[in-house]
UniProtKB/Swiss-Prot annotation:
UniProt keyword terms in alphabetical order: Chaperone, Periplasm, Protein transport, Signal, Transport
Classification via InterPro entries: LolA/LolB/LppX (IPR029046), OM_lipoprot_carrier_LolA-like (IPR004564), OM_lipoprot_carrier_LolA_Pbac (IPR018323)
Principal subcellular localization: periplasm
Entry keyword annotation includes Chaperone: yes
CDD domains: LolA
Any one of the GO CC terms: outer membrane-bounded periplasmic space
Record-given protein name: Outer-membrane lipoprotein carrier protein
NCBIfam families with a match to the protein in the record: lolA
UniProt keyword 4Fe-4S present: no
Record's signal peptide: 1-21
Subunit structure and binding partners: Monomer.
Record organism: Ectopseudomonas mendocina (strain ymp)
Biological function: Participates in the translocation of lipoproteins from the inner membrane to the outer membrane. Only forms a complex with a lipoprotein if the residue after the N-terminal Cys is not an aspartate (The Asp acts as a targeting signal to indicate that the lipoprotein should stay in the inner membrane).
Pfam families the UniProt entry points to: LolA
């Protein structure tokens, strides 16, 4: 009986060590791919589906990211909307409503997915359980938040030929948001003024 217990403990220890090694390898690989880009600019296409697969929304636009923590997410189809962060504040501008919402940037990666691409990559291991699979030129990472109050249940990041290709977020009710990145450019000069926002005259301002 003692021998069986020892064998079971040994098997369990081996399983835990293997899982830890796999996660360390996944973290190292993801950190490597994210760290290679100090700036990213791309066209994006975003599709949101409910749990049954019914389309809820389709949008498209342009994004610009710069480390550490700067991003500009400009939706131009079907209706314009602009999300800008200078690393401390976030401005959300809706031209149709002539409304600007201002709030402090939530530095938690589980609440601000854009920071996965533009923030401090050293925080990834602290915030997520990470798994990955690699085949040919494609690498897929599955990130599951450790925090219970995360805005999503899981996030998939895919790279093709070391370039960011697409992202998928799944929330607690099964809603899926698929984002495809097109014409991706890395490490090209990006003007800092893109990450500031001047409030248009006459716009309503909501401070949160």
């Amino acid at each position: 009986m003692r021998v069986i217990r020892l064998l079971m403990l040994a098997a369990l220890s081996f399983t835990l060590l293997t899982a830890q090694a796999d996660e360390e390898a996944a973290t190292k690989r993801l950190t490597e791919l994210l760290s290679q880009a100090q700036t990213i600019s791309a066209r994006f296409s975003q599709l949101t589906l409910d749990a049954s697969g019914t389309q809820l929304q389709e949008t498209a636009g342009q994004l610009v990211l710069k480390r550490p923590g700067l991003f500009r997410w400009h939706t131009d189809e079907p209706m314009e909307q602009l999300l800008v962060s200078n690393g401390q504040k976030v401005w959300l501008y809706d031209p149709d409503l002539e409304q600007v919402t201002i709030q402090s940037l939530d530095q938690r990666l589980t609440h601000t997915p854009a920071l996965l691409l533009s923030g401090d990559v050293s925080q990834i291991r602290e915030n997520f359980e990470i798994d990955y699979k690699e085949g040919g030129s494609v690498v897929d990472f599955i990130l599951k938040p450790k925090a219970k109050d995360s805005l999503f249940d899981s996030l998939r990041l895919s790279f093709r030929n070391r370039m960011l290709n697409d992202m998928q977020l799944i929330d607690s009710i099964g809603q899926r948001t698929n984002i495809l990145f097109l014409n991706v450019k890395m490490n090209e000069p990006v003007e800092d003024h893109l990450f500031t926002f001047d409030i248009p005259e006459g716009a309503d301002v909501i401070q949160e």
